[in-house]
Amino acid sequence: MLFKQAILVATTLTDLAVATPVVDVRRRTDPASSCSTGTLNCCNSSGTVEDKTIAGLLGILNIVVSDITALVGITCTPITVVGAGGTSCTSQTLCCDNNNFSGLITLGCIPININL
């Protein structure tokens, strides 16, 4: 199953030219109810770089991370207006640094306790 997902991601992103960025993201300390230093995102899942799925995606995209302890968001979409009609996040709401790789991977995230 994981292999199929990796192949799907690889074939979907064939036209995406990604340089090899080195990202230095340390543990964020924002309060769990605010997002003043990043963007508010609705992500399908999140985890650490030690997670095999996330490590595989980082490898496919040639994203090199150094000293990352914050969460990594997977398949995230920005939430632009909090409380607007129709805005909802049924997955995980995360506040992430502006290290977004086409919405597939977003680095430097912390969970946010917010009702949308």
UniProtKB/Swiss-Prot annotation:
GO terms for molecular function: structural constituent of cell wall. Aerial growth, conidiation, and dispersal of filamentous fungi in the environment rely upon a capability of their secreting small amphipathic proteins called hydrophobins (HPBs) with low sequence identity. Class I can self-assemble into an outermost layer of rodlet bundles on aerial cell surfaces, conferring cellular hydrophobicity that supports fungal growth, development and dispersal; whereas Class II form highly ordered films at water-air interfaces through intermolecular interactions but contribute nothing to the rodlet structure. Residues 1-19 form the signal peptide. Keywords: Cell wall, Disulfide bond, Glycoprotein, Secreted, Signal. It comes from the Eukaryota. It is found in: Secreted; Secreted, Cell wall. Disulfide bonds join 35-95, 42-89, 43-76, 96-109. This is Class I hydrophobin 1. Transmembrane segments: none annotated. GO terms for cellular component: extracellular region; fungal-type cell wall. Induction: Expression is increased by carbon source limitation. SMART domains: HYDRO (SM00075). Belongs to the fungal hydrophobin family. Glycans are attached at residues 44, 100. Self-assembles to form functional amyloid fibrils called rodlets. Self-assembly into fibrillar rodlets occurs spontaneously at hydrophobic:hydrophilic interfaces and the rodlets further associate laterally to form amphipathic monolayers. InterPro entries: Hydrophobin (IPR001338).
